[in-house]
Amino acid sequence: MKTRISWIFYCLVSFMLLPSLSAAERFVTNESNGFTWIQQGKAYPILVDLQEDKGVLRAVANLQTDAGKVTGATPEIIHSPSGNRMLIIGSVENSSWIKQLMQAGKIPAADLKGKREKYILQTVKQPVEGVEEAIVIAGSDKRGTIYGIYELSRQMGVSPWYFWADVPVEKHDIISIKDRKSTR
């Protein structure tokens, strides 16, 4: 009997700790620190390669819509650099922008090459000519890139259950991304 109670207690504690082990590091803040992507109704654009997989392009379009729902500001999706700050999103497989950043040593190739379903999100200073700073979401493959995009949406305040269960979107005036590298 004592063994059974110990076993039940062990199982309950394990199930309570399990969600905290899988939770992604919090990289989005609603204060004006780090890389401020959206503030006062203005958003920096999202740069994505047209050669990117259709699933990634759809996730980028969803991110654009989600940003509008959260802040009221809808970022523009662009295919060549424009302006001094932006989000750069792509996979190692298909994005010329991500390949260029890896070749220049601005994002670590070792974190992505040969990996499956992995992404990094990090701030990069002067990622391409004419751009002062960017947040880069780079995936090892299509799924990794999509995971990174939807993790950003989730941390902004859009529940994965928004579409299916009508979970309300958290409204914020500011979306900032902390100056650090996040991987998953």
Report residues per predicted region.
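Accessible peptide chain termini
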Residues: 1, 182-184
